[in-house]
Amino acid sequence: MVRATPIHRYRNIGIMAHIDAGKTTTSERILFYAGVCHQMGEVHDGAAVMDWMEQEQERGITITSAATTVFWSGMDKSMPQHRFNIIDTPGHVDFTIEVERSLRVLDGAVFVLCAVGGVQPQSETVWRQANKYFVPRMAFVNKMDRTGANFDKVVEQLKARLGAYPVPMQVPIGAEDGFEGVIDLLKMKAIHWDAASQGTVFEYRDIPIELVDKASKARAFMVEAAAEATEELMDKYLNEGELKEQEILEGLRERTLKVEIIPVFCGSAFKNKGVQAMLDGVIHLLPSPADRPPVQGLDEKGNECRCKASDSEPFSALAFKIMTDPFVGSLTFFRVYSGVLNSGDQVYNSVKLKKERVGRILQMHSNQRDEIKEVRAGDIAAAVGLKDVTTGDTLCDQNHIITLERMIFPEPVISMAVEPKTKSDQEKMGMALGRLAQEDPSFRVKTDEESGQTIISGMGELHLDIIVDRMRREFNVEANVGKPQVAYRETIRKSDVKSDYKHVKQSGGKGQYGHVVIEISPMSDVDKQHPDVKGDFLFINEITGGVIPKEFISPIEKGLRETITSGPLAGFPVVGVKVKLVFGSYHDVDSSEMAFKLAASMAFKQGFAKANPVLLEPIMKVEIVSPEDYLGDIMGDVSRRRGVLQGQDDSLSGKVINAMIPLGEMFGYATSLRSMTQGRATFAMEFDHYEEAPTNIADTVIKKT
């Protein structure tokens, strides 16, 4: 079969933003103008197509990355048809995992910002994630019709707060109630959208006289930014003082793909203004899969290799999301990097080392689905029938094995106990939690060995609320939840602590004998770069002369790794520790793997107790936005919560207070802030780092355990 759309006309893009920037509304307008939806859904009505989960429609926020495909031929239908695979990502900090995994498989992103709120804390988090994957992006300043909208201020914030180099492609005509349209700086024409036709009809007009000077200056800045792309363009610009429209686009595109500049568009998605012009910008300025560097991976022998975005290359794809669909079962969302896959084909999972058959391939449109026969390089689709795939696995041709770079997911910072309300729900709850954990790598489930309780862990209170909510709605499991618990960690402060333990048991017949001598130290910065570091723990074998036979080294390491999952201090995981195995002895008859495993475990527990053990607590980066009247109360409250103020800023929404506050002090903060400020302040927080807990806090936590 011939490819329907050439790969250079593909755009795999994410729509990303801070919560409430109007991201889902922008996505809805894209679907409407591209002819996918024949009526518009509004987030506040709970009718948005991209927000398809019940919780999303109730809460008016986006939780999962909905994927959809649309076609676009330009605002005036003058361009060849382009295929957009769009992923709408959540803006709430508890769901950054969804943003992370989407960015991993996208080629470009549209960063939606609120013209009133500007750059918010979550904007910074998303921006950092996009930088990590070197994703070219452009900005859309939305909500230009809102009271307090200020395009220039937001452009300034992109520079000051995100370190970006914004290049406005448009100048707004008016703002707030007087927002009428935009000036296209390429054509130097004003664009007005017709309200009666919901923005489907538009016209070019002359620039209003009062904005000619502003538009000319903005255009000169844009042309200069384009000219800096190449020496040829710069020479032409210096000699002639101007560039042609096509040359400007080529220069801006080249610099956008190198993530040197951020083209900025503006509009009001809700008022149907500016979205189509932004889509034209996606075609002109964001990359196709062929424009991105070949994706890197490792072949069977562990050598580096690359996948070129071409149908003629062997098949390779990355599974970036697993989802349970009530009608077809488990769905595996994947991005094809090279080659072609037909439904019914066999694929090789190079992470699990297993072959699997793809039953059906579905093109997803939010939660609706169309069955398709094949996918090609650059496509994003969902497969039915894959049983053992998890997020981040590579699917490839079994004759050309490759493992693409895996995704790294954050460790949960909050836990709570959960138990079914009835005996009959016990089994159902286990199955439901297993399914949800398979879908969401930042959500963990474990059973507490002592109490037998089921403990769920995640990225924040909202994250776990929604998990419990989904259990009830999707799996009919009613559950009681305990109070949130902080995910503390344990470590040591003393270096080179020696611990010698001999495990000997003689009870007639074959005995048990294992003897190890270890040295325990905190990991240094150099240690952290060591290739053998696994999960913030480093084991180094320094045994010489066969004092412990080789076959017992692995059980020793295993014994240590099992012990650090529940630290000797208070049962929390141990982090940042290096253990050297320096000496030991064995018995020809009585030594066994189990004996050495036990000896290693006991040696570690004894050594840990002597190495000045300390408890670490998670510290959250908190940003509070409030009217000035309440600053004194808020700062006093931050200090009472053991917070450290990091500084203050002015924003379009009020005063911004930045602070580092222990997570243990933040439970119920939303309610407290609301009552302190009559509901006029907002806050956002994200995990920043672990820090040693003060002695009184550590003592309280240890006593409780």
Curated annotation (Swiss-Prot):
GO terms for molecular function: GTP binding; GTPase activity; guanosine tetraphosphate binding; translation elongation factor activity. GTP binds at residues 17-24, 88-92, 142-145. InterPro entries: EFG_II, EFG_III, EFG_III/V, EFG_IV, EFG_V, EFG_V-like, EFTu-like_2, G_TR_CS. GO terms for biological process: ribosome disassembly. Residues 8-290 form the tr-type G domain. It is found in: Cytoplasm. Its main location: cytoplasm. Disulfide bonds: none annotated. SMART domains: EFG_C (SM00838), EFG_IV (SM00889). The keyword Nucleotide-binding applies. Keywords: Cytoplasm, Elongation factor, GTP-binding, Nucleotide-binding, Protein biosynthesis. CDD domains: EF-G, EFG_III, EFG_mtEFG1_IV, EFG_mtEFG_C, EFG_mtEFG_II. It holds the Pfam family EFG_C. NCBIfam families: EF-G (TIGR00484), PRK12740.1-5 (NF009381), small_GTP (TIGR00231). HAMAP family: EF_G_EF_2_B. Catalyzes the GTP-dependent ribosomal translocation step during translation elongation. During this step, the ribosome changes from the pre-translocational (PRE) to the post-translocational (POST) state as the newly formed A-site-bound peptidyl-tRNA and P-site-bound deacylated tRNA move to the P and E sites, respectively. Catalyzes the coordinated movement of the two tRNA molecules, the mRNA and conformational changes in the ribosome. Belongs to the TRAFAC class translation factor GTPase superfamily. Classic translation factor GTPase family. EF-G/EF-2 subfamily. This is Elongation factor G.
